[in-house]
């Protein structure tokens, strides 16, 4: 929104022209989202406490988590508000990539909100029925995937790029919609599964979002995309502002979610930010790089799939002490803080490996 005001003011005061550049608006976006999170955080927490929106802890989970019963949940609303506010202020609202990413994030946020509401009001740790949740995730995911496909303007938007290999891609055509759907919905659920310890999901999300912001800027820049020999997609650079807002809001939320957490993001947060990562990765054609950088999310998801599969196919035998994976390490004796920080360290390494694909090819 402010881009229009600064464009007008730049006619009279040349200094305002700096806000036309994506780099400057990206910086302002991360700072704005961070500041808003700091300001509204304590108020949101007090509001959630007054509403008695406390977390219900699964009885089959680690016993050490029972102490967290009653901690305010649904704190993801502050993430969504901070991100949306920063985008409204610094984003180009005519850019369809930015609009699709924002609306997809909010759509999954609504699904998560309903899920959290059922958990809180009915004191049911399982919340919304799995089939119902998956149905609505599929609806929002397919709408986002099909919209991106229908608005594609360059061949790269219907290709699967192979990282670390020069000019190597797989033409997908209409199958792009299918891939996009699985990436968006899959990432949303993967982040949701990871959100089981204080700060465990939000910090990897911040790291991956920051890296995807770099990919978005480079892919949307004619000179840099040519220099790095990656596809040029006009307009997709605006997603750097979206990613920056997610980074700022995520760091602001971490301030209150760090161990011992004052608030949990709930499904309203985890489903939304996961979908946000997925839709950005699809838009900038870095689905495989997301798979690498989000390795923690992938490992958490696979641990659940393998655990359930093993239990059903091997007469109740389990692979892990408990799933998702972070609970397995807790059961092995790792302190919660050790699990969190070690998973962060792994994510840092994976993000650096992902970013290296910009030059290694």
Swiss-Prot record:
Record's keyword annotation contains Transferase: yes
Has UniProt tagged this entry with the keyword Metal-binding? yes
Which cofactors, if any, are listed as required? Mg(2+)
Picking any one GO molecular function of the record gives:
UDP-N-acetylmuramoyl-L-alanyl-D-glutamyl-meso-2,6-diaminopimelyl-D-alanyl-D-alanine:undecaprenyl-phosphate transferase activity
Report keywords, A-Z. Answer: Cell cycle, Cell division, Cell inner membrane, Cell membrane, Cell shape, Cell wall biogenesis/degradation, Magnesium, Membrane, Metal-binding, Peptidoglycan synthesis, Transferase, Transmembrane, Transmembrane helix
Q: What class of enzyme is it?
A: transferase
Q: Pathway, per UniProt?
A: Cell wall biogenesis; peptidoglycan biosynthesis
Enzyme Commission designation = 2.7.8.13
Question: Where does the record place it?
Answer: Cell inner membrane
Give the bilayer topology: Multi-pass membrane protein
The record's GO CC annotations read: plasma membrane
Q: Which residues cross the membrane?
A: 21-41, 73-93, 94-114, 134-154, 168-188, 199-219, 236-256, 263-283, 288-308, 338-358
- Name the Gene Ontology biological process terms: cell division; cell wall organization; peptidoglycan biosynthetic process; regulation of cell shape
Q: Which reaction does it catalyse?
A: UDP-N-acetyl-alpha-D-muramoyl-L-alanyl-gamma-D-glutamyl-meso-2,6-diaminopimeloyl-D-alanyl-D-alanine + di-trans,octa-cis-undecaprenyl phosphate = di-trans,octa-cis-undecaprenyl diphospho-N-acetyl-alpha-D-muramoyl-L-alanyl-D-glutamyl-meso-2,6-diaminopimeloyl-D-alanyl-D-alanine + UMP
The record's family statement is: Belongs to the glycosyltransferase 4 family. MraY subfamily.
- Primary role: Catalyzes the initial step of the lipid cycle reactions in the biosynthesis of the cell wall peptidoglycan: transfers peptidoglycan precursor phospho-MurNAc-pentapeptide from UDP-MurNAc-pentapeptide onto the lipid carrier undecaprenyl phosphate, yielding undecaprenyl-pyrophosphoryl-MurNAc-pentapeptide, known as lipid I.
Protein name per Swiss-Prot or TrEMBL: Phospho-N-acetylmuramoyl-pentapeptide-transferase
Organism per entry = Hydrogenovibrio crunogenus (strain DSM 25203 / XCL-2) (Thiomicrospira crunogena)
Organism phylogeny:
Bacteria, Pseudomonadati, Pseudomonadota, Gammaproteobacteria, Thiotrichales
């Amino acid at each position: 929104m402010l881009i229009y005001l600064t464009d007008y003011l730049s006619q009279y005061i040349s200094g305002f022209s700096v806000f036309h550049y994506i780099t400057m608006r990206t910086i302002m976006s991360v700072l704005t989202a961070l500041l808003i999170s700091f300001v509204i955080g304590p108020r949101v927490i007090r509001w959630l406490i007054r509403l008695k929106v406390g977390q219900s802890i699964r009885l089959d989970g680690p016993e050490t988590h029972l102490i967290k019963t009653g901690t305010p949940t649904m704190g993801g609303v502050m993430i969504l508000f901070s991100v949306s506010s920063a985008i409204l202020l610094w984003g180009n609202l005519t850019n369809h990539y930015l609009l699709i990413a924002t609306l997809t994030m909010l759509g999954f946020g609504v699904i998560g909100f309903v899920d959290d509401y059922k958990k809180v009001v009915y004191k049911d740790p399982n919340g919304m029925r799995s089939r119902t949740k998956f149905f609505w995730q599929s609806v929002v995911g397919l709408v986002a995937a099909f919209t991106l496909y229908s608005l594609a303007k360059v061949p790269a938007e219907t290709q699967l790029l192979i990282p670390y290999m020069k000019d190597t891609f797989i033409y997908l055509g209409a199958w792009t919609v299918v891939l996009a759907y699985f990436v968006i919905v899959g990432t949303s659920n993967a982040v949701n599964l990871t959100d089981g310890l204080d700060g465990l999901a939000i910090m990897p999300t911040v790291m991956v979002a920051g890296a995807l912001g770099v990919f978005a800027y480079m892919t949307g820049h004619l000179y840099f995309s040519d220099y790095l020999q990656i596809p040029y997609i006009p307009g997709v650079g605006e997603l750097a502002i979206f990613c920056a807002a997610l980074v700022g809001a995520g760091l602001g939320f971490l301030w209150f979610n760090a161990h011992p957490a004052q608030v949990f993001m709930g499904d309203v947060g985890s489903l939304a930010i996961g979908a946000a990562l997925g839709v950005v990765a699809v838009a900038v054609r870095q689905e495989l790089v997301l798979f690498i950088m989000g390795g923690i999310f992938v490992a958490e998801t696979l641990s659940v799939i393998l655990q359930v599969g093993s239990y059903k196919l091997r007469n109740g035998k389990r692979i892990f002490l408990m799933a998702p994976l972070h609970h397995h390490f807790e059961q092995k004796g790792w302190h919660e803080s050790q699990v969190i920080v070690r998973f962060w360290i792994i994510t840092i390494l994976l993000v650096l490996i992902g970013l290296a694909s910009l030059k290694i090819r």
